[in-house]
């Protein structure tokens, strides 16, 4: 079965960040953000995969269920700077330690996720 080509939301990529961490600037991003147009609602920094240029960051809208997330066709690898262009609200949090997780609490702000609050889910204004 031939895989259907994804239609990523077109954006003009500007250099918004300088990333000099040793593991690289790759990140895994849900299609809810890059294809369906949601803002980042949940972000977690895992241990980077050492065999790849991986920052450890994983970005989701926050409305993905387990079935959606278990399908690798629903996420892609991007450069951090590219995802910052999709959602610049994430920039202040990018140097957080491995193990950090943040949820969106309103249109522009995140806070550390202690699993006590719902994720604020919103579409990008494009």
Where are these regions (language model features)?
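N-terminal low-complexity, intrinsically disordered segments
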Residues: 1-38
């Amino acid at each position: 079965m031939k895989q259907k080509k994804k239609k990523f939301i077109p954006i003009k990529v500007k250099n918004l960040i300088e990333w000099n961490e040793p593991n690289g600037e790759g990140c895994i991003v849900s299609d809810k953000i890059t294809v369906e147009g949601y803002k980042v609602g949940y972000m977690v920094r895992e241990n980077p995969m050492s065999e790849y240029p991986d920052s450890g960051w994983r970005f989701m809208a926050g409305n993905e269920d387990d079935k959606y997330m278990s399908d690798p066709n629903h996420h892609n690898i991007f450069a951090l700077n590219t995802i910052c262009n999709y959602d610049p609200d994430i920039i202040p949090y990018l140097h957080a330690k491995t193990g950090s997780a943040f949820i969106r609490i309103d249109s522009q702000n995140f806070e550390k996720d202690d699993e006590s609050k719902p994720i604020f889910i919103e579409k990008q204004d494009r």
